[in-house]
A protein has these predicted regions:
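Vicinal oxygen chelate
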Residues: 11-14, 70-115
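N-terminal beta-strand motif that seeds the catalytic metal site of vicinal oxygen chelate
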Residues: 1-16, 69, 126-128
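Short glycine-enriched loop/turn motifs at secondary-structure junctions
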Residues: 1, 62-65, 104
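Core segments of cupin and vicinal oxygen chelate
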Residues: 7-52
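Conserved catalytic-core motifs of GNAT/GCN5-like acyltransferases
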Residues: 29-33, 98-100, 123-128
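Long, continuous compositionally biased terminal/linker segments
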Residues: 38-81
Length: 128
């Protein structure tokens, strides 16, 4: 199951304002915003319903950045197995398995760039 998807935008503030209005009829609102200082990348805004950000926009300055797709893993061992298999298949490391506390205390994810440079993630939200 897809956990969340994220894609680059050319003008972060403009796109954030657009999605705030466009997604409102779907009961989607701004759930989380992550700054560059918090995670070392361009700012990102996560929209969703019921407190779960599953639709992310981010980046600044171009649409040539990779797509980001996160897939739910049943447990942390599965996240680890995904990472190992993806690297063995020719993927490039984009974040080894581990806690990403800037999202929430139990966010355990691993990130791999596919052959085209897209950021593929496996994530588990449950405690160890």
């Amino acid at each position: 199951m897809i956990d969340h998807i994220g894609f680059p935008v050319s003008d972060y503030e403009r796109s954030k304002a657009f999605y705030l209005k466009a997604l409102a009829p779907l009961d989607y609102g701004l759930v989380m915003e992550v700054t560059q200082e918090e995670h070392g990348h361009d700012p990102a805004a996560g929209f969703g319903a019921n407190g779960k950000p599953d639709f992310w926009i981010g980046g600044e300055g171009g649409l040539d950045k990779p797509l980001h797709v996160a897939i739910v893993a049943k447990d942390r061992a599965t996240v680890d197995a995904f990472y190992t298999a993806a690297i063995a298949a020719g993927g490039r490391d984009n974040g080894a398995p581990g806690i990403r506390a800037h999202y929430h205390p139990n966010y355990y994810g691993a990130f791999v760039l596919d052959p085209d440079g897209h950021n593929i993630e496996a994530v588990c939200h449950t405690p160890a």
